[in-house]
Swiss-Prot record:
Pathway: Lipid metabolism; fatty acid metabolism. Induction: By 2-(p-chlorophenoxy)isobutyric acid (CPIB). It catalyses: acetyl-CoA + H2O = acetate + CoA + H(+); butanoyl-CoA + H2O = butanoate + CoA + H(+); hexanoyl-CoA + H2O = hexanoate + CoA + H(+). Residues 341-550 form the START domain. This is Acetyl-coenzyme A thioesterase. Homodimer or homotetramer. Keywords: Allosteric enzyme, Cytoplasm, Fatty acid metabolism, Hydrolase, Lipid metabolism, Repeat, Serine esterase. Gene3D superfamilies: 3.30.530.20, Hotdog Thioesterase. Its main location: cytoplasm. It comes from Rattus norvegicus (Rat). GO terms for cellular component: cytoplasm; cytosol. The lineage of its organism: Eukaryota, Metazoa, Chordata, Craniata, Vertebrata. Residues 6-118, 180-295 form the HotDog ACOT-type domain. GO terms for biological process: acetyl-CoA metabolic process; acyl-CoA metabolic process; fatty acid metabolic process.
């Protein structure tokens, strides 16, 4: 691995020993969390010049695993300093010492606060930005901070919206499981080796203990080998010190096909509090697991059947947190996108156009779409796959299907109703049913505006179908190279499916398999802290219905 350490960066390298591994020979997630927290703390103190403590940790997604004998390298640095707190970027890679091949294990962001002596006031110095990537992370740090600050309000709002989904007292159904047997309690006495150099219990050690009890809880449900896939955003509510007794309570909250969420609550007791039974709530965290059987195949978890009101609260909370995680994927774990697209070849226009249409139909037919929002005329669904997030917006429109098709297939009209579109022009009329457009979109997250080159393929219904199709995907056109004024971006698969309800109304479904460049426009809505999708959908409905009332219906 590259040994060079950038200014302000801290590098930790560890050879994975048997003591660091679980029963399957893989690096314990708890051990990795300890190393990550230590490295991040040292990076924070390198910038601040005084002691710092962990305040919170953003979502952590483990993209791979590491095994005994491999080398783990952890790099941490401050991305942005605020008045008395800092965001720390943590990147973990693993290398096989025999082949030299290295892989990314995870990217995480944590927040540290300074711990001055006495009443000393501290104002942190700004971070010196030297590369373009550092400037990007610096801008995104502000967005991530907004997400952290509004997290509790966002969660509360989603919980209020979801109260109608299910009665809190339910009877058992076939193929479901209750969570009573997954409850786990454990206690730890904080000793000097568990404390950091400030005298407080080491934050990474608390994370490791939480991971241990959560793993036991998950194993009681799956009867297999659970492994930690991600950790939800959490913050430390208060400190603990040497001599404290820490009590950990874990229980399964909900399952989502191949994953399970386990909640862990941590309370701290000093000697007096222990005798009185009055502890301090210092942390709550939510850990998401996958599991494999003896053949290393992913296990499908049984659906959870909430019985009590407390079961129901935890069940609904897990659904809300999952939705928020989907929206946070861009701002928490931003990956620099390398724009891709199909190379446009006029001699293969028929094949490329058909691929465009079939991709949209395949996306719509996938199973696993989950509803996130229901309004009077609008329903929003999301589909989470291994490496992709897709959104579907269904709109009930009081206009004939052919009118909606005529309006939505003409992308030059899209800026009239879509607030994200600035301009849209035809640059190649390929055929009567296929056009290539150049599109410019609005600025998001303070970055440069984005532009796209897309193929739009439209299809009227066949005899055995009644669906109008408008599909689009990015293409690479040498005559329209990237411009330094814009960020050339990608549409993987998107479009409209329009079906008549009767002679005067239709259902319009908009689908988009989101690339990293598209996700910023949708992240807030998916995560629950924005209403941009609902607003665009309402604008689309109004645009189509107004056009009908203005006489377009008679023209057609």
């Amino acid at each position: 691995m590259e040994p060079t350490v950038a200014p302000g960066e801290v590098l930790m390298s560890q050879a994975i020993q048997p003591a660091h591994a679980d029963s399957r020979g893989e690096l314990s997630a708890g051990q990795l969390l300890k190393w990550m927290d230590t490295t991040a703390c040292l990076a924070a103190e390198k910038h601040a010049g005084i002691s710092c403590v962990t305040a919170s940790m953003d979502d952590i997604l483990f993209e791979d695993t590491a095994r005994i004998g491999q080398i783990v390298t952890i790099r941490a640095k401050v991305t942005r300093a605020f008045s008395t707190s800092m965001e720390i970027s943590i990147k973990v890679r693993v290398q096989d010492k025999f082949t030299g091949i290295q892989k990314l294990l995870c990217v995480a962001f944590s927040t540290f606060v300074v711990k001055p002596l006495g009443k000393e006031k501290v104002h942190l110095k700004p971070v010196l930005l030297q590369t373009e990537q550092e400037q990007v992370e610096h801008r995104l740090a502000s967005e991530r901070r907004k997400v952290r600050l509004q997290h509790e309000n966002t969660f509360s709002n989603i919980m209020k919206e979801s109260n109608w989904l299910r009665d809190p007292v339910c009877n058992e159904e076939e193929g479901t499981a209750t969570t009573m047997a997954t409850s786990v309690q454990s206690i730890e006495l904080v000793l000097p080796p568990h404390a950091n150099h400030h005298g407080n219990t080491f934050g990474g050690q608390i994370m490791a203990w939480m991971e241990t009890v959560a793993t036991i809880s998950a194993s009681r449900l799956c009867h297999g080998h659970p492994f930690l896939k991600s950790v939800d955003m959490f913050k430390f509510r208060g400190p603990s010190t040497v001599g404290d007794r820490l009590v950990f309570n874990a229980i399964v909250n909900n399952t989502f096909q191949n994953s399970v969420e386990v909640g862990v609550r941590v309370e701290a007791f000093d000697c007096r509090e222990w005798a009185e039974g009055q502890g301090r709530h210092i942390n709550s965290a939510f850990l998401i697991y996958n599991a494999v059987d003896d053949q290393e195949e992913l296990i499908t978890f049984p659906r959870i059947q909430p019985i009590s009101k407390d079961d129901f609260r935890r069940y609904q909370g897990a659904i809300a947190r999952r939705r928020i995680r989907l929206g946070r994927k861009y701002v928490i774990s931003h990956k620099k996108e390398v724009p891709l697209g199909t190379q446009w070849d006029i001699s293969k226009k028929g094949s490329i156009s058909n691929t465009n249409v079939e991709a949209l139909k395949n996306l719509a037919s996938k199973s696993g779409w989950e509803i996130t929002t229901t309004l009077e005329k609008i329903k929003i669904y999301t589909l989470e796959e291994q490496d992709a997030i897709s959104v579907k917006v269904e709109k009930q429109v009081g206009s004939p299907a052919r009118v909606a098709y005529h309006l939505l297939s003409d992308f030059t009209k899209r800026p009239l109703w879509d607030p994200h579109y600035i301009s849209c022009e035809v640059i190649d009329q390929v055929s009567e049913d296929d056009q290539i457009y150049y599109i410019t979109c609005s600025v998001v997250n303070g970055d440069k505006p984005k532009d796209f080159v897309v193929l739009v393929s439209q299809r009227k219904p066949l005899k055995d179908d009644n669906t109008y199709i408008v599909a689009l995907m990015s293409v690479v056109l040498p005559s329209v190279p990237p411009s330094p004024q814009y960020i050339r971006s990608q549409v993987i698969c998107a479009g409209f499916l329009i079906q008549p309800v009767d002679s005067s109304s239709c259902t319009v479904a908009y689908l988009n398999q989101m690339s990293d460049s598209i996700l910023p426009y949708f992240a807030g809505n998916i995560g629950g802290w924005s209403k941009s999708i609902e607003e665009a959908a309402a604008s689309c409905i109004k645009f189509i219905e107004n056009a009908t009332h203005d006489g377009l219906k008679s023209v057609l």
